[in-house]
Amino acid sequence: MAMKRIAILVASALMLASFGAQPSAEEGIFTQGEFFVGCNYWAKNAGMYMWSQWRPDVVEKEIGELAKHGVTVMRVFPLWSDFQPLTGVCAAGGSYKRFLQNNRPLSNPAGVDDEMVRRFRFMCDVAERNGIKLIVGLVTGWMSGRQFVPVVFEEKNVLIDAEAIMWQTRFVKYFVSALKDHKAIAAWDYGNECNCMGRTSQAQFYNWMDIIGSAIRLTDPTRPVVSGMHGLSTEESARAPIRLNGELADILCTHPYSFYVSGCGKEAFNTMRTELHPTAESLLYADLGGKPCFVEEIGNLGTSCNSESRTAAGMRCTMFSAWANDLKGCLWWCNSDQEVLDFPPYTDTANERELGMLRQDYSPKPVMLEMHAFQKFRKSLPFRKLPPRRTDAVIVVPERSAGWIPGFGAYLLARQAGFDPRFAGAEMELPESGFYIMCSSENNMSYSYPAQKRVFEKARAGATVLIVYAAGSRFTALRQQAGLEVDYSSRSPIERTFELFASPGRKMSCGDSGTCRLIARECEVLAKTTAGEPVFTRFKYGKGTVLVCNSPIDRQTIARTDVLTGTQVQPYYLLFREAMKIAGVKRVAAKGDCPWVGLTEHPAADGSTIVMAINFEPRALSCPVALDGRLGRVWRGEVKADRIDLPPNECALFEVVRTK
């Protein structure tokens, strides 16, 4: 008996050790500094019905064409309703006495169709022969606004129904076990936007992710698990917050379609808001979730929304920006146009029919040629990996209210001003920095008192803190911490016109949903309205500095269309640039007054700095620049010691060599 107990204990320990061995998120296709391009894949002949309308000849030819044009990674989907075709004997009241498989006895305890698994393996074999790695979306029960679940679950919420979850778990274990030996598979994915499959509380969604994630890892502890979700929130109380996904997934992802994300899609596809949206959203996920992130789905929603030329130009900027920010990769939605398909969702909306990189005749679209050209350029470089970018500031976003809009606005203003930020959630410990930007409040509950204290303590310890103030902002001891007194607050909307003393003649106008009138007491006024009201102030607090901008320029950057593109923009970025100077931020490549060009700096091991400059405008620009060092090698673009000349939507990549 004693020996038997020891054997059981040893076996249990080995099982737990196997389950506890987490795969590294910085290996394989997700290696730091690397970058993959590819697509989400549904065979062109049948789209989501590719498994039931199986054409191996189409799969083989199409994947070969994708590989020929530079695709190295595909995200693929075993459609749940096809791979686990559960039917059943239904009793009165809708309960099932027993489950069947296509109205026949189950062929295995998981109810999985083995023929579908064989078809999936064939696709994996084709991918491997073509050098393509696969991310497999396991529970694919939601696709393009439509449910694809086994018929027995069509009237159930599959995220909370115990029976549905039991069968999902069985499917995941069976499928992963059957295919985990295949070398083409790089990662498992929970499924396609599973947070859209039903309404849940946060606890219910946590439990679903934990159950499915555990089933994956118990069966295959060697591969990372990708979130696969869409539209996560900064809010602590949200149904699917970023932090929860960071806890339960190894890799995070974004699906930054400009028309489907709040505050986006307000200008052309090849302008700053749209081009930096994937970068900003992915960095927000990575910084708050604490896991690497990549752009898992991106697209132009077809020629009914964007021309092919604008799409290719915008995608060029998006890819270079994502690579510069170590976002691992970018997958287009999807592989081929599907205008020939005659079932929903392809018959419901034009947006679903022309999303491909390839046309139906296998000819590549400009966006595919651009993605291939990007990969060819990367391979031509003398270095394989881009060193991590340098960051100069921390954008603090609220976690008691929605933080995406002000966070995105602050990020865009920072890039316009000439520095590179990262994100942090207000309700957790803040990363160390000499410069913090606290986003404007949506209401008086946006920031807890401990969150406010943490930010002001950073200033007391020596940092520069910029508070973007709004009518809904409420701060305790503002007089003691910022040298400002609140005169009154009201619900009356206001439009302020003001200018920064350091930039005379550069007037700007900013609205707010309410009015908060501040009186400057012990602080220095750096900008004021035409009526003399302080808008931008500086106050010495402890060893540091507190700056207050009494106008929600972060939110208005997103609300307006005259801030980011065009020859005459609202110069809100001037306030961020002044804050950057006060914070003592020094850049190796300091750009002049050119808000349409973004620079990232990548310190190399030899002491030099690799600089990437991206022109986010669809017009040629000459960007003034001051280099702290000598101009070294130039790998892309027209770069001089004092300026960078950039064609429309183009990038420069060059080296600055230290001379001191």
Q: Locations of the language-model features?
A:
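Active-site mouth of glycoside hydrolases
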Residues: I29-L244, A249
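A short, well-structured beta->alpha microelement
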Residues: L413-P431
